[in-house]
Amino acid sequence: MSAAGKSNPLAISGLVVLTLIWSYSWIFMKQVTSYIGAFDFTALRCIFGALVLFIVLLLRGRGMRPTPFKYTLAIALLQTCGMVGLAQWALVSGGAGKVAILSYTMPFWVVIFAALFLGERLRRGQYFAILIAAFGLFLVLQPWQLDFSSMKSAMLAILSGVSWGASAIVAKRLYARHPRVDLLSLTSWQMLYAALVMSVVALLVPQREIDWQPTVFWALAYSAILATALAWSLWLFVLKNLPASIASLSTLAVPVCGVLFSWWLLGENPGAVEGSGIVLIVLALALVSRKKKEAVSVKRI
């Protein structure tokens, strides 16, 4: 049996730490909106994140060879500029917990895009999960009482999830055509490309003047060192030492912990209707995760 198939306490601990790091990053992302524009922060986050990732790449002796440009740029635009940039923009007027949940609808978009572009058939359980998620989204959005600001935030958060899902399809095609591509190298180069793109966006789009408070520096340090370099290193370690089905639990745990952290630290009470929608989305995520696990077990040789 491979190491990834065994119960590894150290890897499970790494998964817990990883989940907490990525969950708490939503709190910093929300708090920093009071001092810096969404695109300025995303650009700086990508710049420092790329710097730290390339240092990690050098320390691990992986070399600096660029990954396939076309796919890497597409992932940078969709995953980092699209997912992170849109989520940060959504947080300007939206709550951290709500934005986290809507961004983490990504697995549903992956299922839909895989059916449309990769020819993967939707199973009955996936149809059911998508219906549950759609109803959950309806309850979270509460369109009967939305104003423009909350509607804008919700749509940006959903588009963040859509963009993230599209990046997963691009990544699948990349791995199909270049199976030996190194994940850490890919992450580093796409972060560099995203830093360049977001820097241009930040220069072109008018935003609030940056108020260089300690929160901004703490948020940048947290994003670059913990949420990027350490978290991705932990993710690689977790993937190597745990089954993919267990590693994918972070897809469920991060938005849930994000909601709990925002409730506890930011006083964001979702209310009965929105809370019910969040529960339904998490249930649907669990169903999609279970179906993925079954599909992987069938396809393994």
UniProtKB/Swiss-Prot annotation:
<feature type="transmembrane region" description="Helical">
    <location>
        <begin position="186"/>
        <end position="206"/>
    </location>
</feature>
<dbReference type="InterPro" id="IPR050638">
    <property type="entry name" value="AA-Vitamin_Transporters"/>
</dbReference>
<feature type="transmembrane region" description="Helical">
    <location>
        <begin position="72"/>
        <end position="92"/>
    </location>
</feature>
<keyword id="KW-0813">Transport</keyword>
<feature type="topological domain" description="Cytoplasmic">
    <location>
        <begin position="1"/>
        <end position="8"/>
    </location>
</feature>
<feature type="transmembrane region" description="Helical">
    <location>
        <begin position="128"/>
        <end position="148"/>
    </location>
</feature>
<feature type="topological domain" description="Cytoplasmic">
    <location>
        <begin position="290"/>
        <end position="301"/>
    </location>
</feature>
<keyword id="KW-1003">Cell membrane</keyword>
<feature type="topological domain" description="Periplasmic">
    <location>
        <begin position="30"/>
        <end position="38"/>
    </location>
</feature>
<feature type="topological domain" description="Periplasmic">
    <location>
        <begin position="267"/>
        <end position="268"/>
    </location>
</feature>
<feature type="transmembrane region" description="Helical">
    <location>
        <begin position="269"/>
        <end position="289"/>
    </location>
</feature>
<feature type="topological domain" description="Periplasmic">
    <location>
        <begin position="207"/>
        <end position="218"/>
    </location>
</feature>
<feature type="transmembrane region" description="Helical">
    <location>
        <begin position="99"/>
        <end position="119"/>
    </location>
</feature>
<feature type="topological domain" description="Cytoplasmic">
    <location>
        <begin position="172"/>
        <end position="185"/>
    </location>
</feature>
<feature type="topological domain" description="Cytoplasmic">
    <location>
        <begin position="240"/>
        <end position="245"/>
    </location>
</feature>
<feature type="transmembrane region" description="Helical">
    <location>
        <begin position="219"/>
        <end position="239"/>
    </location>
</feature>
<dbReference type="GO" id="GO:0000101">
    <property type="term" value="P:sulfur amino acid transport"/>
</dbReference>
<feature type="topological domain" description="Periplasmic">
    <location>
        <begin position="93"/>
        <end position="98"/>
    </location>
</feature>
<feature type="topological domain" description="Cytoplasmic">
    <location>
        <begin position="60"/>
        <end position="71"/>
    </location>
</feature>
<feature type="transmembrane region" description="Helical">
    <location>
        <begin position="39"/>
        <end position="59"/>
    </location>
</feature>
<comment type="function">
    <text>Involved in response to cystine. Overexpression confers tolerance to excess cystine.</text>
</comment>
<feature type="transmembrane region" description="Helical">
    <location>
        <begin position="9"/>
        <end position="29"/>
    </location>
</feature>
<feature type="transmembrane region" description="Helical">
    <location>
        <begin position="246"/>
        <end position="266"/>
    </location>
</feature>
<keyword id="KW-1133">Transmembrane helix</keyword>
<keyword id="KW-0997">Cell inner membrane</keyword>
<feature type="domain" description="EamA 1">
    <location>
        <begin position="13"/>
        <end position="141"/>
    </location>
</feature>
<keyword id="KW-0472">Membrane</keyword>
<dbReference type="GO" id="GO:0000099">
    <property type="term" value="F:sulfur amino acid transmembrane transporter activity"/>
</dbReference>
<protein>
    <recommendedName>
        <fullName>Probable cystine transporter YijE</fullName>
    </recommendedName>
</protein>
<comment type="similarity">
    <text>Belongs to the EamA transporter family.</text>
</comment>
<keyword id="KW-0812">Transmembrane</keyword>
<dbReference type="InterPro" id="IPR000620">
    <property type="entry name" value="EamA_dom"/>
</dbReference>
<keyword id="KW-0677">Repeat</keyword>
<dbReference type="Pfam" id="PF00892">
    <property type="entry name" value="EamA"/>
</dbReference>
<feature type="topological domain" description="Periplasmic">
    <location>
        <begin position="149"/>
        <end position="150"/>
    </location>
</feature>
<feature type="transmembrane region" description="Helical">
    <location>
        <begin position="151"/>
        <end position="171"/>
    </location>
</feature>
<feature type="topological domain" description="Cytoplasmic">
    <location>
        <begin position="120"/>
        <end position="127"/>
    </location>
</feature>
<dbReference type="GO" id="GO:0005886">
    <property type="term" value="C:plasma membrane"/>
</dbReference>
<dbReference type="GO" id="GO:0016020">
    <property type="term" value="C:membrane"/>
</dbReference>
<feature type="domain" description="EamA 2">
    <location>
        <begin position="152"/>
        <end position="289"/>
    </location>
</feature>
